[in-house]
């Protein structure tokens, strides 16, 4: 008795052999090991850029509100001490108009605290005992005494050391004119703590 095979069917079972599967897994593991450090770096850069951009957004909101309302607008750390703990943007409408947040002031924006692995340092009015950034009705960066107030804030990862610290730092520079920009000190020679644009 002879068996007839159906046309179009082979006698070999469909699927992968164990060797083919092991080679595929080995190649995938090698590719993952090569890509993982790049992914971590990309994630860190993304978080850092997002924090710097959030600060610039707050600065631009304050400047825009100051020009729109014809009043001083201020950016202050939420806890009145550290920029890392978040910041509040408000229009100084109170009778004192002293650059501090009062009940009668208009809160425009609030930023929650940054992640614990960020460190923020500052110069200019942003580094005073009670730090602040103030913009007048023309959009200029001002001090409480009425002078021009250029300032710089550096946002860096505090969980790194060595050469990677420079790569993982962003500076927000606010010029006398009130214009804010973000730069990376490791690649931009004009990105200094004393830059006043």
What is each PLM-predicted segment?
Residues 19:
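Residues within the helices of the helix-turn-helix
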Residues 1-13, 22-25, 30-60, 64, ...:
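N-terminal helix-rich module
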